[in-house]
Curated annotation (Swiss-Prot):
It comes from the Bacteria. InterPro entries: G6P_Isomerase (IPR001672), G6P_Isomerase_C (IPR023096), Phosphoglucose_isomerase_CS (IPR018189), SIS_dom_sf (IPR046348), SIS_PGI_1 (IPR035476), SIS_PGI_2 (IPR035482). One of its GO terms (molecular function) is carbohydrate derivative binding. GO terms for cellular component: cytosol. Its EC number is 5.3.1.9. Its main location: cytoplasm. NCBIfam families: PRK00179.1. Keywords: Cytoplasm, Gluconeogenesis, Glycolysis, Isomerase. This is Glucose-6-phosphate isomerase. One of its GO terms (biological process) is gluconeogenesis. Belongs to the GPI family.
């Protein structure tokens, strides 16, 4: 057994968690529950009162965090200590949104000047594209950007760009390509004009299979539209560490933006990987995005854990995963622009904390990362919310909503907000059998049917949720929101004693994919894989069933 599960606090939480009354009773016992269980920081407001906790629960959770030396681990990350022990790397995505006056050491050097130089280089490039100064090979300004990446190099820029749609530069559009499925890039290129299209290729090595394949196909398309090899530099730029390969491809060394080993892919949107975001919304808004994240960094680093928003959210997740048997967590965004956030947080959390050994290689004997999923309100209310209300699985929920809409049309936002708050109330409160039966008292149902229907209308409630609010969705509040979930993910990993910053499962998938590709391209049937894989490869080689 691990030391975590043998701790006195862990065992106390196991006992305590099974003894709490229903949340209805917790609210009845404490009229000040909302005021005592809410916190504001960095333009965000968190109501966590609709959780299965009382003062004693929170005390135990914070004790668990202290036993895990959470504060020391937070300091170690911000200081650039090598906390990614399997790859021997610092974890300094926070440095990407630091201020120019700060000093942050990685590998023996202050990395802040290099970060600031990259931002300045981005600003110059973004300004030239947005102003129309940057011309394509026929002298026309850029109208379309195609961002080519995979994983964090794709999902972060895409979701943030989608969320900041009200801030896009007029006349500029962006198209995101990640999947190696040819349909993805073919559909994107179908209606584009090569003369006015700019490609941004993001790959640290300039050799990531999906990204390189898509970039080569984009180049073939570009040349096929009448352009020449010497025109490539006007239409292709890269975010990469491999300047040699990028220049061999035809890119100008002046239009190659750096990546660093101390930034993981799923934390990289704050770096030059965010170039597509900056091209769309402008450098001022990109800087505001960084500033929102920096504000959350400061809150996370400096605030006592009892009032620390990322810590509170993380410890609640630990509570449900380790002491209530929850296997998933749902993110529900009540804002159309934020509809992509569940997928982004899914990658952030599951790639980080989908681990089964501790930092020292011990097999864990407790649950780690949950399945993260979700969608857009109110759509989900007519689908999977049914399972949240009456299913047998406990699924904690995060509701995220701005108080003000970018599109204030009639009563739309009032209805959206009422649905959001109503769902949190319904999950917490539920409906008893007596309440259901009373609601049916004036119905036209046969008296013998009413007890049966009432039974089907019962909802046990006591389903936990957080509500996250902001005045309005802006670059600053979005930056703070994303950083909040980054730090929440870190805290969970710190409690579970796992490495949240490697991804060996992803690496194995890449390795085996390349092995299979060799068999597909061979001049004979596959025989040296497992029986199923051999058969699938050979069936694919035939091209038909």
């Amino acid at each position: 057994m691990t030391t975590l599960t043998q701790s006195t606090t862990w065992k106390a939480l196991q006992t305590h968690s099974s003894q709490l009354p229903h949340m209805r009773e917790l609210f009845a016992q404490n009229p000040q529950r909302f005021e005592q269980m809410s916190v504001a920081a960095c333009g965000l407001f968190l109501d966590y009162s609709k959780n299965r906790v009382n003062d004693e629960t929170l005390k135990l959770l914070f004790s668990l965090a202290k036993e895990a030396k959470l504060s020391e681990k937070i300091t170690a990350m911000f200081n650039g200590d090598v906390i990614n022990n399997t790859e021997q790397r610092s974890v300094l995505h926070t440095a990407l949104r630091s201020k120019a006056t700060q000093t942050i050491i990685a590998e023996g050097a202050n990395i802040v000047p290099e970060v600031q130089q990259t931002l300045a280089k981005m600003a110059k490039f973004v300004g030239s594209v947005q102003s129309g100064e940057w011309k394509g090979y026929t002298g026309k300004a850029i109208t379309d950007i195609v961002s080519i990446g995979i994983g964090g190099s794709f999902l972060g820029p895409k979701i943030v760009s989608q969320a900041l749609r009200p801030y896009w530069q007029e006349g500029l559009n962006c198209h995101f390509v990640a999947n190696v499925d040819a349909t993805s890039i073919c559909e994107k290129l179908k209606n584009l004009n090569a003369e006015t299209t700019l490609f941004v290729m993001s790959s640290k090595s300039f050799s990531t299979q999906e990204t390189l394949t898509n970039t080569l196909s984009a180049k073939d398309w570009f040349l096929g539209q009448g352009a020449s090899q010497q025109d490539v530099a006007k239409h292709f730029v890269a975010v990469t560490s491999n300047v040699t390969k990028a220049t061999e491809f035809g890119m100008d060394a002046n239009n190659i933006f750096p990546m660093w080993d101390w930034v993981g892919g799923r934390y990289s949107l704050w770096s030059a990987i965010g170039l597509p975001i900056a091209l769309l919304v402008g450098m001022d808004n990109f800087t505001a995005l960084l500033d929102g994240a920096h504000q959350m960094d400061q809150h996370f680093a400096d605030t006592p854990i009892e009032q620390n928003m990322p810590v509170i959210m993380a410890m609640l997740s630990v509570l449900y995963g380790n002491f209530h048997g929850a296997q998933s967590h749902v993110i529900l965004t009540y804002d159309h622009y934020l509809r992509g956030l569940p997928a982004y947080f899914q990658q952030l959390d599951m790639e980080s904390n989908g681990k089964s050994v501790t930092l020292d290689g011990t097999d864990v004997d407790y649950s780690t990362g949950p399945v993260i999923w979700g969608g857009e309100g109110t759509n989900g209310q007519h689908a999977y919310h049914q399972l949240l209300h009456q299913g047998t699985a406990l699924i904690p929920a995060d509701f995220i909503m701005p108080l003000q809409s970018h599109n204030p049309l009639g009563e739309h936002h009032d209805q959206l907000a009422s649905n959001c708050f109503g769902q949190t109330q319904a999950l917490m409160q539920g409906r008893t059998y007596d309440e259901a039966l009373a609601e049916l008292s004036n119905s036209k149902l046969d008296e013998q049917q009413k007890p049966l229907i009432a039974k089907h209308k019962v909802m046990v409630g006591n389903k936990p949720s957080n509500t996250l609010l902001m005045d309005k969705l802006t670059p600053t509040t979005l930056g703070a929101l994303i950083a909040l979930y980054e730090h929440r993910t870190f805290v969970q990993g710190a409690i579970w004693q796992i490495n949240s910053f490697d991804q060996w499962g992803v690496e194995l998938g890449k390795q085996l994919g390349n092995d299979v590709l060799e068999r597909i391209g061979a001049d004979h049937d596959a025989t040296d894989l497992d029986g199923s894989s051999n058969a699938l490869v050979n069936l694919y080689r035939k091209g038909k069933l």
